Amino acid sequence: MSGSVYLRDERAHLISENECMTDKPFTRRLCSCCSYAAVRKRLPILNWLPQYSLQWLKLDLIAGLTVGLTVVPQALAYAEVAGLPVQYGLYSSFMGCFVYCVLGTSKDITLGPTAIMSLLCASYIDHDPVYAVLLTFLCGIIQCVTGILHLGFLLDFISFPVLKGFICAAAITIGFGQVKNILGIHNIPQQFVLQVYYTFLRIHETRVGDVTLGLICILILLCLKFMKGHMKSTEPNTSFLVKSCCTIIWFFATARNAVVVLSAAVVAFVFTDHNLDVFTLTGKTAKGLPPFRPPFFSEKTENETLSFKDITEDLGAGLAVIPLMGLLESISIAKAFGSENDYRIDTNQEILAIGLTNILGSFVSSYPVTGSFGRTAVNSQTGSCTPAGGLVTGSVVLLSLAYLMPLFYYIPKAALASVIICAVLPMFDYTIFKKLWKVKKMDLLPFLLTFIMCFWEIQYGIVAGVILSSFILLYRVSRPQIQTILKSNLKACE
């Protein structure tokens, strides 16, 4: 889908506004809001749907199916990071596909659970699905208000060094958090420092089967990723057999997460069928589609009933950090792929799309979602033409929920851990230290502060980084570089 579609719509919207300039102010505003161009601005599907072709349909089907095979195993794994039962990863993976198809302005981006959002959620929900779903609803409300009031500029307060510091710390935290599943060790604390301590303290409890399977899965995933990155495009005169082999290799490399998880599940089933307890399995999961219902605004526990006020107090800073980071992650990805593929996105419309996805997602037991860089890259590389590919991806997830949930019992936790570890490895940018040192040494301070403090508490790391970054900015603004030009020098120049 070319960027010209959006450019024509912007011109049409401006023309319709100019036609109303001769009317009264209220009539002018009403005319602007009710014009067809304004409706198309709020419903971007109307921009590309009239031009939809069979060629686009073919490419969107391929892209949607490929992303679907990627998101199912990732969703199961990310639910583990969020501290929720694995089915909640799938509950969070389909609503964004349908909502974004109607409201999104990027042809490439896919919404769903991500490693970073899962880690953020785990910091606030304490393994409680009720907290997770209510957090999703409140995040959606906050994001929609941000979009309606055009408050997207607030994202600029999180500077590049702060964002990079958080992402690098998150990559280490998420990756090390899965070491316990690779080793087959249980009941490890969630806090990072305690996690490191108790993992090494109880390393003697390592299960050989889990370690062996986990390392093999990691090796296969890395090899398949390497093969995909080094595949060359076939020449026109290449034989049919060679083209077929290249296509098969490309498919397996692209859907490597699904291939590895499925293969590991088959191996685990064989061992379990022979009464051999070799691997730590995912275990029983809820069957079928999630019920469509509003989130619970209170929760009954064994000792007390938690009110809406109690839950929001427990969520605390998460009500600010999670919606803000979700918007920042998604919009950064959308802008990057829009620039790469030569089209523009509407930032405020993107914010509304993400917000509405989270609001509606809370009605199907989703936890907060955002744009996924990995799946967006897959979507773009497989030739998606419109957001319609999301309909196929969402359908794949729904079919998995409807028919495959009993089979997820046999998925080893070590296999899911390997998927997560390989997904977060590229998130750690080891070159960022050198880049910041060369470009602007002072930016290393907020980067390092955010990076270090995020190992203690994520929200403290982000807030501390933003505050320090703001102080540095104010310091530079308050001390501008002024050059004094003497009058004698001016005469000499003349």
Annotate the PLM regions.
Residues S2-S488:
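Transmembrane helical cores of multi-pass ion-transport proteins
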Residues S488-E494:
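Solvent-exposed, non-transmembrane loop/terminal regulatory segments of multi-pass membrane proteins
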